[in-house]
Amino acid sequence: VKIVTDPEVDLRKCVVGVACAAQAIKDGYDVDVFFAANGVKMLNDEFIQSLNSSGMLPDGMIFDLMKTITQQATSVYCSTGSQAANGVTKENAAEKLLAGYDDWMTWSGPPGVISLSANSDVQLIY
């Protein structure tokens, strides 16, 4: 599952992508999730906290979805360049990303996207 849409432009699309990834994981599929472009905002702790507080989703729902992905996906990748464009680097990630990111997230870029795409049977892009 690739999450590339800016949640500030089309939040519903991002949430649907995250929900589909979480459901596929719960259904027993091997799921790799790659956050790129402005979709990397979905890994930003402040953004997720704000989204939960906004009332646009049931309270705690986004935390549950992201917990499923971060704890049970086969792998979670983020675009290093996209994160940098949003002010997140490896040096300041601990202050900005979801807790425990260094345990479940792999910094990557186009080679990772290509490899995952070439090795996947199904791709969902949001």
Question: Which residues does each predicted region cover?
Answer:
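Short, glycine-rich nucleotide/cofactor-binding loops
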Residues: 1-15, 47
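Solvent-exposed loop/turn segments at secondary-structure junctions
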Residues: 7-8, 38-41, 82-86
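Histidine-anchored nucleotide/phosphate-binding helix
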Residues: 13-27, 33
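Short amphipathic alpha-helical segments and helix-helix/interface helices
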Residues: 21, 63-67, 113-114
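Short internal beta-strands
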Residues: 21, 31-37, 76-80
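N-terminal beta-loop-helix "entrance" segment that forms/cooperates
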Residues: 39-52
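A glycine-rich helix N-cap at a beta->alpha junction
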Residues: 50-83
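N-terminal glycine-rich phosphate/adenylate-binding segment common to multiple enzyme folds
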Residues: 80-126
